[in-house]
C-alpha cells in the first residue's frame, strides 16, 4: 500500500465509528485522484479528495475545506 493510501486509511479510521458511513469510493483518472464520500447520522456530508500528483489529502465537510494533509 502506498504511503498516501496509508495516510488516507489513518484519516478514514479516525472518522469511522463516529457516526460516519461510507457512501462511495471512486477514482478520478483524469485528475489522478481518488474520492471517498461519507454521510453522518446527522445528515452532514464528508468528502476525502486524495490527489496522487500533489500528494495532498483534503477533507471537506458540507463542501467546505476542513483539513489538508500533505505527505513529505
Show the residue positions of the predicted features.
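Short, non-transmembrane alpha-helical segments in secretory-pathway proteins
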Residues: 1-21
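Short intrinsically disordered terminal tails
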Residues: 1-3, 69-72
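Short, low-complexity interaction segments enriched in Ser/Thr/Pro/Gly
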Residues: 6-7, 61-63, 67-69
Amino acid at each position: 500500500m502506498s504511503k498516501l493510501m496509508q495516510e488516507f486509511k489513518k484519516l478514514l479510521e479516525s472518522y469511522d465509528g463516529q457516526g460516519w458511513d461510507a457512501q462511495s469510493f471512486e477514482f478520478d483518472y483524469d485528475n489522478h485522484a481518488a474520492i471517498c464520500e461519507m454521510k453522518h447520522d446527522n445528515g452532514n456530508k464528508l468528502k476525502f479528495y486524495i490527489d496522487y500528483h500533489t500528494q495532498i489529502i483534503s477533507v471537506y465537510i458540507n463542501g467546505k475545506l476542513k483539513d489538508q494533509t500533505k505527505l513529505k
